[in-house]
Swiss-Prot record:
This is 3-hydroxyacyl-[acyl-carrier-protein] dehydratase FabZ. CDD domains: FabZ. The keyword Ligase does not apply. Keywords: Cytoplasm, Lipid A biosynthesis, Lipid biosynthesis, Lipid metabolism, Lyase. Belongs to the thioester dehydratase family. FabZ subfamily. GO terms for cellular component: cytoplasm; membrane. Involved in unsaturated fatty acids biosynthesis. Catalyzes the dehydration of short chain beta-hydroxyacyl-ACPs and long chain saturated and unsaturated beta-hydroxyacyl-ACPs. It comes from Helicobacter pylori (strain P12).
Length: 159
């Protein structure tokens, strides 16, 4: 197991993400992971398109991607980081685990996210003990911070 974490690849495509995260359409909010350093940090992104169902109501004639979904995307990225830091890329173990949100702190929304944006999640491990992980970071578009947050989650057995 230690060997798999040391040799963990740094980029993951959607077919890999689907093997680790339990989320599915319309709630999977990570398209690709472009950097991952076990126990340290992750950079991932979601491409925001006008075809997102959420834009039917948020808001007609002024589409803005909801802040709560930005935070959820950050949480999913953090969950991927926590899982792969503990078990490497292991789809069989992923079938037996689930990551639960525990707290959201220091959330700030700075700039609206709109169709055509590439929403990047930049998260670092703040601390972890056993199955409890705390991550913090930003969501960015074109290098500008659009949101920031600290998140705490717990990895548990799936029932």
């Amino acid at each position: 197991m230690e060997q798999s974490r040391q040799n963990l690849q740094s980029q993951f495509f959607i077919e890999h993400i689907l093997q680790i995260l339990p989320h599915r359409y319309p709630m999977l909010l990570v398209d690709r992971i472009i950097e991952l350093q076990a126990n340290q940090k992750i950079v991932a992104y979601k491409n925001i398109t006008f075809n997102e169902d959420v834009f039917n109501g948020h808001f007609p004639n002024k589409p803005i991607f909801p802040g709560v979904l930005i935070v959820e995307g950050m949480a999913q990225s953090g969950g991927f980081l926590a899982f792969t830091s503990l078990w490497g890329f292991d789809p069989e173990i992923a079938k037996t685990k689930i990551v639960y949100f525990m707290t959201i702190d220091k959330v700030k929304f700075r700039i609206p996210v709109t169709p055509g944006d590439r929403l990047e999640y930049h998260l670092e491990v703040l601390k972890h003990k056993g199955m409890i992980w705390q991550v913090g970071g930003t969501a960015q578009v074109d290098g500008k911070v659009v949101a920031e947050a600290e998140l705490k989650a717990m990895i548990a057995e799936r029932e």
